[in-house]
């Protein structure tokens, strides 16, 4: 399970962990509640709060902490300050691991491209071409063909035809 938030979710993390369910913390940009997507911990006081929150999440029993859109400098400090692995998304190279949303990595959305997401493929174009091919095949009666269709055995079809005549 992954919970977004800092000290305000610490007791919840502890309770869930104590019941036997592993919990991953999530700090920085909190996409489930964010009103706007912006880089986190650009100011020193915000950075101090985030570092404290990371330590609190670790103390509460989080097995790992996602750091989303946190400045690389603060990510490095947090990673050195906690013993649990940090996983970055848009937070630079200083985390113990990295994650990307597969839609961003594969270029599924043409117009949505977060600055921190490297596109390894442009699937939006391939998807558009595939859908256009499908539509054309349906219009031209090339799909579905025999390969993609189920049929009755010939003798059963003959029996059916006799029953409905």
Residue ranges and their predicted role:
Residues 1-165:
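Alpha/beta enzyme core
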């Amino acid at each position: 399970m992954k919970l977004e938030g800092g000290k305000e979710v610490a007791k919840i993390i502890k309770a869930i962990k104590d019941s036997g369910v592993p919990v991953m913390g999530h700090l920085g940009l909190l996409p489930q509640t964010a009103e706007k997507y912006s880089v986190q911990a650009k100011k020193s006081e915000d950075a101090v709060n985030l570092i404290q929150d990371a330590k609190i999440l670790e103390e509460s029993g989080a097995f790992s902490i996602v750091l989303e859109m946190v400045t690389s400098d603060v990510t490095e400090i947090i990673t050195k300050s906690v013993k649990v692995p940090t996983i970055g998304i848009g937070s630079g190279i200083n985390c113990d691991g990295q994650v990307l949303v597969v839609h961003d990595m594969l270029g599924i959305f043409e117009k949505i491209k977060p600055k921190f997401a490297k596109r390894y493929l442009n699937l939006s174009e391939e998807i558009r071409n595939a859908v256009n091919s499908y539509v054309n095949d349906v219009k031209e009666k090339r799909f579905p063909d025999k390969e993609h269709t189920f049929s009755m055995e010939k003798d059963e079809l003959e029996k059916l035809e006799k029953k409905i005549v």
